[in-house]
């Protein structure tokens, strides 16, 4: 049984829609395998669900290099920092914050070790999970400028949403909840 199938089996019956969406996600071929699993790794890391992270990373190792997996994790870790900062700048009433330099190190964005549009797509997925509108707009603009189409962008965000819903369903089930189909 694959790591993703093991996660599927842990999703409780109250989250049947989540199971169906996970099945659809795994069958979807809109994204290349590297893009797909990069979105899944970055999104799983953004959920902070250790079981989901381990399963997705294990599955990703069959289609991604260790460098690409590390880049997806780097996307999640640096983007969450930017999400918190820029969401604050956007929501704060004081306009002075918009004029201040962020002073946040983020060199990995300039040299992620993988195709920049892949890294940008993974970053968009994380920004979508974290709800940073400024970041979402910036990633979407960069992707469009790189020639990435709307369907690819929407698919990455849909995969991020499904990944987040899987994490929530697993957490809501708790450790002693019955497995799917029990």
From Swiss-Prot:
In terms of Gene3D superfamilies, this protein maps to: AhpD-like
- The protein in question is named Alkyl hydroperoxide reductase AhpD
Q: Does the keyword Oxidoreductase apply?
A: yes
Per the record, the gene is ahpD
Q: Which cysteines are cross-linked by disulfides?
A: 132-135
Name the catalysed reactions: N(6)-[(R)-dihydrolipoyl]-L-lysyl-[lipoyl-carrier protein] + a hydroperoxide = N(6)-[(R)-lipoyl]-L-lysyl-[lipoyl-carrier protein] + an alcohol + H2O
One Pfam family per UniProt: CMD
Q: Which organism is it from?
A: Bradyrhizobium diazoefficiens (strain JCM 10833 / BCRC 13528 / IAM 13628 / NBRC 14792 / USDA 110)
The record's similarity note reads: Belongs to the AhpD family.
């Amino acid at each position: 049984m694959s790591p993703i199938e093991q996660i599927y089996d842990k999703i409780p019956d109250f989250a049947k829609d989540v199971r169906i969406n996970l099945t659809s996600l795994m069958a979807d071929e809109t994204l290349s395998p590297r893009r797909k699993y990069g979105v899944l790794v970055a999104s799983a890391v953004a959920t902070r669900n250790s079981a989901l992270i381990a399963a997705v990373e294990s599955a990703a190792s069959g289609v991604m290099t260790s460098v690409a997996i590390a880049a997806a994790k780097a996307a999640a870790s640096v983007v969450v920092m930017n999400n918190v900062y820029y969401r604050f700048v956007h929501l704060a009433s004081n306009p002075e914050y918009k004029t201040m330099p962020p002073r946040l190190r983020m060199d990995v964005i300039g040299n992620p070790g993988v195709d920049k549009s892949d890294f940008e797509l993974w970053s968009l997925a994380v920004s979508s999970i974290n709800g940073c509108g400024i970041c979402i707009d910036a990633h979407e603009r960069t992707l469009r400028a790189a020639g990435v189409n709307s369907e690819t962008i929407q698919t990455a965000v849909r995969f991020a949403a499904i990944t987040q819903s899987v994490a929530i369903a697993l957490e809501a089930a708790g450790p002693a909840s019955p497995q799917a189909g029990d």
